[in-house]
Each structure stands twice: as structure tokens, then as C-alpha cells.
Amino acid sequence: MRVREELVSRFFRYAAIESQSNGRSQSLPSSPGQAALAALLADEMRAIGLEDVCIDAHAIVTGVKRGNRPAAPPIGFIAHLDTVDVGLSPFVRPQVLRFEGEDLCINRQEDIWLRVAEHPEILDWLGEDIIVGDGTSVLGADNKAAIAVIMTLLGRLDHEVGHGDVFVAFVPDEEIGMRGAKAMDVSRFPCDFAYTIDCCELGEVVLETFNAASCEIVFTGVSAHPMSAKGMLVNPLLMAMDFISHFDRKETPECTEGRDGFYWFKDLIANDSVASLTALIRDFDTDGFNRRKHRIAAVAEQMRSRYPTGNVRYQITDTYRNVSTSLARDERAVALLFKAMEELGIGKKVIAMRGGTDGAVLSAKGIPTPNFFTGAYNFHSRYEFLPVPAFERSLEVALKVCQLAATE
């Protein structure tokens, strides 16, 4: 099977399995479809000759493609099983359309269009095949394009390149706090360094991520009948709104870019007695990150003084750290990636990613893990699309990295 056909076939096969993560679940994995996808991948890994294939109770799959260059450093690739829940359908219906410069109708029945004026980046792919969904869901190239790249890579290593041991890991629930990567026993993934394939357009390389934390703030009010509420009722919903008002409206995701940090007040559930607010804290700079956490604490204390008959409790939990510190301690992964892209004639676009990846978790565990492109655009959107030529180039980079690692 030609490389292009295999990549597209694998992507369609993996996309057909509903694996949207569920942030309300405390289970790992948070959805049964992730376990089903993990089982399929484990079977396919065994079929193409991987050794030590293991799938555990949390749907974490690991294995190794043994090398033919014993002196080469062991390297790894990691991808996540889940697709994101942004309120769209969990069922993905991918299709391949040829882009000829006109708006693409991705769902005629629902009259959903991928419009060039709104997504001018598609103009770079004039005359090419584009994988899109049907507009009712995300496409799920984040991260099933990476799974397809890694599985195609593993099946072709012996035929195309000399290589050392190549370890692979597929983990659940990246989209809800990197739960799978955090739970993974890295003794099952004993590589010197690794790669995530979890960013967007052709040439993108991520050497920095946010520092990230989540915060749960609980406001306890005082309930009362409205006919006798004066001087007594403390409305927890209004307490939460008051809390939010203490933060700069411009320090939010929709008002920031580049290296700006932000607060994201994300979920609010309230009744007459209690309101629960979720806030996400993001900053590239460690000092700025800590200042933001201290700001949450300071505002909570102000609220306690303002509402003496109510109460405010909060808990801040670190989610992941900026990957840059770990990458600086061992530069081989980045050097090989840059060399691979240079030899393939792919211009690199180094970005500070306004998000995080499983690689941030692995890096904190001692395995430096930079991130490179799948080739897709518009992650977490119904307008997510994947140009097939960019998809192929992602595989070429992975193959070249394995080859170069064996000759270092």
C-alpha cells in the first residue's frame, strides 16, 4: 500500500472509533471508546512485529520496535487516544475533498461550509486533497493523525531506514489534564528522548508550552426566601460574578496572544446555597505563573471579608510545566528534529505553544519530549482540516528522525 493511502486509511479507521474524553468522569480512561481504540492499536502493534506490547487497565498502550543499529540511542513517540469535547458530536465522519480554491461544503444537509474568507490558510493547499469532518464534530486530527503517523512509521522502519529501538506510547485523556501521561509508568517507555506529534501546520515545532494550573473555587452563600431576604440572603452566584470581576477582562484567552498569559473562567454551576467556579491559569513565565496563583488567593481573601456570613474556598492544582527547561538539559531531541527537517527541505516554525502536551508531562519525568506538526489546522474546531501532503510530511520527519538517531 502506498504511504498516502496507508496514512489516510489508518486515520479513517481510528477516527471511526468514538473516543471523546469526558472531564466529568473520574475514571481513567474517562470514556469506553478510548479503551476500544487502545485494544485495536495493541493488536496492530503485535501484527507489525512490535515487542513487549502492553495495554494496562487504564488503556495505556506501550511497545517497542527493536532496532537494527544496537549503538543507537533509544527514542520514543507518544500520542493521545482521546479527542476533545467542545460540545460537538463525539462521532467523527471524515471525508477527503479536493480544494480548488472555492469554499468547501462539508455538510450539504446542514449547510455547513469551510469558507476561504474565514480560513485563508487553506489557500496554501490549492489543488490538494484535504481531510475534513462533516461539520458536526471536530475532525480529531488532534491526535489521531499522530496515531496514524506513528503506526505507519512502525510498519515501515525495517524496510526504509536503519534505526535503534523505537518505543511507542498511546495514552488516554490528554485533553482533560494529561491524565494518561501522568499515570504512565515510564519504565515501560525507557527511551533517552521522545517526540509528541501534536501541533498544527506543516513545519511547526513546539519547544515551549504554558505553565498550567486549574483552580476550583467554591462560594457558599446564605439562602433565604426572597420575601424576607433583605440583610440575610447571600447569593453565591453573585459572589462568583463578583470574584470574576476582580480580574482584568483583557487577561483572557480571547484577548491575549503570543507569550501573554491569562485566566480562563470556564465553568460555573450554582444553586441557592453554593456556586462552584472553575478557573484555568496559564503563563509561560514561572514568576508570572506564580503571581497569577497568588492573585487567586488574594481575591479569595478579599471575598471572605466582603461576605462575612458566606465563605470562599479554593484549591489550585498544577497541571503541567513549561517543557523548555527539560529540553535545555538534553538538546539531542531538538537537534535531530531540526536536522531532519532541514534535510527534508521543510522550513521550521518554532512556536511557544499556547497549550500543553503529553510531552510536558514526560519531560518533567526526565524524558525530554519536543513536539512537531501533524499538518492539521484549527484543532478543537468543527473547521479542523488536514491537508494530505502535510500529513505525509509529518511521517517523513518521523522516519528521518529515526534514521538520523541511528547515525549519531
Curated annotation (Swiss-Prot):
Protein residues bound to Zn(2+) 1: H80, D142, D198
Family: Belongs to the peptidase M20B family.
Pfam families: M20_dimer, Peptidase_M20
Name under which the protein is recorded: Peptidase T-like protein RB0614
Enzyme Commission number(s) from the entry: 3.4.11.-
Organism: Rhizobium meliloti (strain 1021) (Ensifer meliloti)
Cofactors (names): Zn(2+)
Keyword entries, A-Z: Hydrolase, Metal-binding, Metalloprotease, Plasmid, Protease, Zinc
GO terms, molecular function: metallopeptidase activity; tripeptide aminopeptidase activity; zinc ion binding
Binding-site residues, Zn(2+) 2: D142, E175, H380
NCBIfam families named in the record: peptidase-T, PRK05469.1, PRK13381.1
Gene Ontology biological process terms from the UniProt entry: peptide metabolic process; proteolysis
The organism's place on the tree of life at top rank: Bacteria
